[in-house]
Amino acid sequence: MDDAPIGWIREVVLNARDPLALAEFWAQVVGGTPTEWYDGWVTLEPPPHGQRLSFQGTDEPPVATTVHVDVLVEDLLTAHEAVIAAGATYVEERWSPRPGLDRKQVPWRVYADPEGHLFCLVVR
């Protein structure tokens, strides 16, 4: 049996009514430079530590999704203020058990980007 993968994840693509505006929001959150390849398709080239994101134009209304982006941060409160200033909407705070750590639970927060895609800020 061959253990080689079928392929690799090239990028994560988010549908957007305004792909460039959404790419600019995400550039503030995770870094990178938005590049508009053609009308309705914008790619956010990541810094060396990031994942490539692309934004595909659509006229369809946003729908609930089962996929979201987790953003690793050093300081939750500082990151919270920054994503709110960039245009995110705070949804809720949750706590997760972290086996092996002195503290029993670690907080993370859920947000919506300007087009309604959910994402989380997770403490490093």
Question: What spans do the regions from the language model cover?
Answer:
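N-terminal beta-strand motif that seeds the catalytic metal site of vicinal oxygen chelate
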Residues: 1-23, 50, 64-71, 122-123
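Vicinal oxygen chelate
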Residues: 1-14, 43, 56, 88-124
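A generic structural signal for short, solvent-exposed coil/turn residues
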Residues: 4-6, 26, 34-36, 45-47, ...
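Amphipathic alpha-helical segments
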Residues: 18-33, 79-85
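Conserved short beta-strand elements that form part of the metal-binding/catalytic scaffold
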Residues: 30-66, 118-124
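Glycine-rich loops and low-complexity Gly/Arg-rich segments
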Residues: 37-40, 78-82, 94-97
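Mid-chain, well-packed structural core segment of small domains
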Residues: 63-88, 92
